[in-house]
Design a protein with these regions (language model features):
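C-terminal hydrophobic helical "lid"/dimerization subdomain
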Residues: 3, 251-255, 293, 297-346
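N-terminal glycine-rich cofactor-binding segment
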Residues: 5-21, 38-70, 85-87, 106-122
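Glycine-rich beta-strand-centered segment in the early N-terminal region that forms part
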Residues: 20-34, 49-99, 140-143
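NAD(P)H dinucleotide-binding glycine-rich loop of Rossmann-like/cofactor-binding domains
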Residues: 94-175
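Adenosine-nucleotide cofactor-binding segment
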Residues: 174-177, 189-252
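N-terminal Rossmann-fold NAD(P) dinucleotide-binding loop
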Residues: 181-182
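Glycine-centered, small-residue-biased loops immediately flanking beta-strands
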Residues: 261
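Rossmann-fold NAD(P)-binding glycine/threonine-rich loop
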Residues: 267-283
Length: 346
């Protein structure tokens, strides 16, 4: 079967790989669509991110949907031909973090397409996958398999909101309106945020943010002072979600957040310096957010029930044979948001 495998920076190959045997409680799935994530791009462009480096060939991808092709003898509640979104989160269930309900911090996590552990955890950009039964989340008849592959990035946004606490009736700023930022805006709208301001440095993501429910969009590249009005009286936003990984964006968030507001760092852009005096003086609650687990089921339900419409986020779909072109397109933020690879009829 064909798989999209990264060997090192700028060395992405479409290779034939072997499918593992089907276990008793597992499913064999024909992969339909896979979305290219920012972490996939980091592996492709730079060979990793931060201290995480590719040390062996790794199949990329963790945002996938598909159709069940075969079932292990012990699987119940799933049928052949069922259309599913596939959760990439595979915690052990036994370590102290899993036992505490913090599955995203599992000490033995097998998250698809991750070079954090060694040997690396192979990803989901393959024509077929063997998955655990619990990873399969059925999708509604009306939901396309392309949209179903958005469940993963939507889950990231839902976990970020969970980390922030209630946003009901709150004034919210989102900086960075790529796929995760835009889907986060859709989730914030559903969670009852009173007003959502979206900021970015490009028009395309801001257009998407507007379609996803932002009340105001601001291009900080063309109007650097546009957020100054929100700095008055010690800040105006109850919550800030920083989804770009930019130090400048984080500082803007600190300037515009109210005292004792919650600032959630969603994007990972590397280590930065922080204005600790400002954080202390404003008593800002600075929180990280990392992946998700239980939120995946909620994300699928939101998509199934039309509570969040992810269609505006998808800007390109290319067949697996053009995977390298798809990665290059995904890296061009002037013309793309979420680019997906199609494995159907590959």
């Amino acid at each position: 079967m064909k798989s999209v495998v990264c060997h090192s920076a700028k060395d992405l190959r479409i290779e034939n790989t072997e499918l593992p045997a089907l276990g008793e409680h597992q499913l064999r799935v024909n992969v339909a669509y896979g979305g290219i994530c920012g972490s996939d791009l980091h592996y492709y462009q730079h060979g990793g991110f931060g201290t995480v480096r590719i040390k062996q060939p790794i199949a990329l991808g963790h945002e996938v949907s598909g159709v069940v092709d075969a079932l292990g003898s012990g699987v119940q509640g799933t049928v052949k031909g069922q259309r599913i979104a596939i959760s990439p989160s595979r915690p052990c269930g036994h370590c102290r973090f899993c036992q505490a309900g913090q599955h995203n911090h599992c000490l033995n996590m097998r998250f698809y397409g991750s070079a954090m552990p060694f040997p690396h955890i192979q990803g989901a950009f393959s024509e077929q996958l063997i998955i655990e039964g619990y990873q399969a989340h059925p999708i509604a008849d009306h939901l396309s398999l392309s949209e179903a592959a958005l469940a993963e990035p939507l889950s990231v946004g839902l976990h970020a909101i969970q980390r922030a606490g209630s946003v009901l009736g709150k004034q919210v700023l989102v900086t960075g309106c790529g796929p995760i930022g835009s889907l986060l805006i859709g989730a914030l709208r559903r969670a009852g945020a009173a007003r959502i301001v979206a900021a970015d440095i490009a028009d395309l993501p801001l257009k998407c943010a507007k379609e996803m429910g932002a009340d105001e969009t601001i291009n900080l590249k063309t109007d650097a002072a546009a957020l100054d009005k929100y700095k008055v009286d010690k800040g105006q936003f109850d919550a800030v979600f920083e989804a770009s990984g930019s130090e400048a964006a984080l500082r803007v968030g600190l300037d515009t957040i109210v005292p004792r507001g919650v600032l959630i760092t969603v994007g990972m852009g590397g280590d930065i310096s922080l204005p600790m005096t400002q954080i202390v003086a404003k008593e800002v609650d600075l929180r990280g957010t990392f992946r998700f687990h239980a939120e995946f089921a909620t994300a699928v339900r939101f998509l199934n029930e039309g509570l969040v419409n992810g269609k505006p986020v998808i800007t390109g779909i290319l067949p697996v044979e053009r995977a390298i072109e798809a990665f290059d397109l995904a890296a061009d933020k002037s013309q793309s948001l979420k680019v997906q690879i199609s494995f159907q009829n590959a």
